[in-house]
Amino acid sequence: MNGMRLVGIGDNATVLTQKARGEGRRNPFVSNSFKQANRLVLDLTYLFEAPGPGAIHRKDFDTLIPKAMEAHELLKENKGDIYDKGIPMTGWQDMPVRITKEHLSRIVESAQELASKIDAYVSLGIGGSYLGIEATIRALTHQYFNQLSKEARGGVPEIYFLGQNMDPDYFRDTLDMLDGKKVGINVISKSGTTTETAIGFRIMRRLLEENWGDRARELILVTTDPEKGALRRLAEQKGYNMFVVPDDIGGRFSVLSDVGLVGLAVAGIDIEEFVEGFKDMRERCMNDDFWSNPCLVHAVARHLAYQKGKKIEVVATNSTALYGVARWMEQLFPESEGHEGHGMWVSPALYSEKLHANGQMVQDGERNILETFLFLREHDNRVGIPMDEEDLDGLNFLPQNNLDMNFVNRMVVEGPAYAHYKGGVPCIVIEVPRRNAYNIGQIYYMMERSVAISGYLLGHNPFIQPGVEAYKKAMFALIGKPGFEDFKKEMERERLKRPRIKL
């Protein structure tokens, strides 16, 4: 039996876009027509007056706008509770206008040089040194990217991620995918001592050196502290090509820095277009007119929902490609807002898949939910629905009306938004016109500035994460890291006091 042929199915537009990038063809991202067609839209149609308890009213905005505008001015002036170890952590907000074409060119040249030598690229990092890179690549490439031919990938290597967890099976399975291939890596860590990433790097560095000896240094990029740290010392000793983790930008805000841009460039993504999206959203979010500023409106909408008793934010998308962006938001908001008993739990969801799982809870469960939709308006591909002579499933009305999967998938947002709103769930819709680097850049900047404003509204520093250090301290003690002996003894004493209950 022969293999299946895609009879009547057109070329995959995502693959065509990847090939175009590989040939140097670009979107006209500086043109006004492109920007108008790709303007991100914040839709509050289903936010106000949801039935039941905890409804948000327009007058609630009026009471909070003065405080939001004060936060807006403080943030613009780099004032307020924004410091980490004496450094103001707001370098991200002007990065779109500070980054130079020369620096972007250096990143692209280094990325292309490495990509030309390898079959597979491994990005090593965790948290903010991982999620934004993975989310952006996933958003802008074929969902089975590594299974495509190099030509279909646009001439770029396969892309893998390690150092983001400690699962030995995942790590070993990834090594199987790399076996027999020429591999390049980029290790991303400010200190070089982040446990998960450092262990992954140690293993990968040994493998590269075992295979290619001194030439391994040509296959290793390092993104780390500009002046100090264990990883910087090693990179200087070995002669690795280095990029910088900025001092004034925290990990979850770092996707526009070298942290994110190097990996995106290796994947063939147009980082100039990506920067342009950040830049244009920054311009909108510096606007002093509240209702013309999507970052301010978004921050106030979420804060009012929190004040009204919403403890869970479902971030749902109708796009598999954008699900990684929802996961990026899952770090950005809780790590910035989860202080002093504050904050909403962020739950990413892919619709319509999750509508057949937690959709019942959203519709009829406790009314402590805010729903945010990352709504992709136009997918890359238009997959037609064929007529069927028997029509046993009753779907012939779709092709009869020239309605395809793209249309049905749009209703996967519009239908649930209406139903959930009528069930008492306020909804925010962020309308993303198309899958391109410009739009992903817009989303990131809007979310970063929104969560910064949220920190001011909540009354705490959104740029630190002291709670994360608690798990690290306990883990270091348990694995026997030098310097944590006393804390390990304290943990053991505490554990002995507690009854061991195992079933």
Where are the model-predicted features located?
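C-terminal catalytic subdomain
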Residues: I312, T320-V432, A437-Q442, E448-I479
